[in-house]
């Protein structure tokens, strides 16, 4: 198995992504099951998927639990729904998909775990010279800063599963620039003012922030 998946005797898996979206795919159905939801997706690489395989959905690592020739299904639990925007999905929604990295592949984005930290709200979209500039605001306080839930100028951040470079970094907001290819091949083409997105902050920054607490 060439997937960058490490299995222990307890069958606990650790997956890694790069924030390079393979496809913006369509939600076929969303089924409520107590506190969980079952999301059925249609995508071009469904025949390559296997049961128990991990796929990032808007940056959230989910496990394939069933599949057909044309669709596959994943389950999002209550904690995931509370922390991400997956609870907003409905039939026809477009979702950014990325399978876990291959050990012999390039790391074209940055290290992404598929563990969303929190959501943010788009507060501005500006088109300029063929590119788009998106501004996002998120909840921020001292405790979050100590956990590494912050951005730095020219650092990396994962927005809806897309690896991006930060500009105009502030305590509770940041901006990213989107090129036409990314705009057209991810669900950034549907993001507008008021849209809720998923954030995963840089894992390197999280570890540095934690180590600084012991200085």
Task: Cite the ranges covered by each PLM segment.
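Short, Lys/Arg-enriched N-terminal segments with co-localized hydrophobic residues
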Residues: 1-15
């Amino acid at each position: 198995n060439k997937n960058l998946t490490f299995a222990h005797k307890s069958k606990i898996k650790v997956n890694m992504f790069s924030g390079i979206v393979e496809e913006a795919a369509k939600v076929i159905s969303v089924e409520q099951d107590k506190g969980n939801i079952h999301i059925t997706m249609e995508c071009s690489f469904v025949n390559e998927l296997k049961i128990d395989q991990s796929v990032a959905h808007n940056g959230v690592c989910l496990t394939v639990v069933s599949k057909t020739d044309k669709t596959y299904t994943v389950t999002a639990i209550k904690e995931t729904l509370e922390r991400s925007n997956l609870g907003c999905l409905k039939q026809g929604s477009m979702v950014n998909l990325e399978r876990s990295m291959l050990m012999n592949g390039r790391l074209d984005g940055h290290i992404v775990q598929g563990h969303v930290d929190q959501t943010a709200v788009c507060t501005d979209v500006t088109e300029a010279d063929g590119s788009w500039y998106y501004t996002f605001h998120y909840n921020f306080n001292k405790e979050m800063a100590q956990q590494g839930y912050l951005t730095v100028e020219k650092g990396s951040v994962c927005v809806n599963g897309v690896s991006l470079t930060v500009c105009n970094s502030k305590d509770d907001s940041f901006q990213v620039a989107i090129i036409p290819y990314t705009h057209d091949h991810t669900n950034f083409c549907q993001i507008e003012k008021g849209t809720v997105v998923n954030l995963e902050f840089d894992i390197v920054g999280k570890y540095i922030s934690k180590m600084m607490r012991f200085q």
